[in-house]
Amino acid sequence: MHRNRIELQNAYERIMNSRSALDEFGEIVIENDGHWNPSEVADPTKLIQLQLFNITASGIGAESALRNWMEKAVTKLRE
């Protein structure tokens, strides 16, 4: 299995099994040398764009963006 696919699978499982999916996503972003600003993602009225493991997703509010990212992750894992 390709390294990126394994990392994506592990990230997906961590997010699904976490108490706070958004906090877990943020931790994964930071672990992968990304930028995560908790105060930015706390505003449910902001347009948020998430990028991780070559998947980009957006939504109004971080929860919406994360749902979009998770849907795209599932699609990529099924390829």
Give short role names for the model-derived ranges.
Residues 1-49, 56, 75-76:
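N-terminal segment of the canonical double-stranded RNA-binding domain
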Residues 51-79:
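Short, compact, well-ordered microdomains
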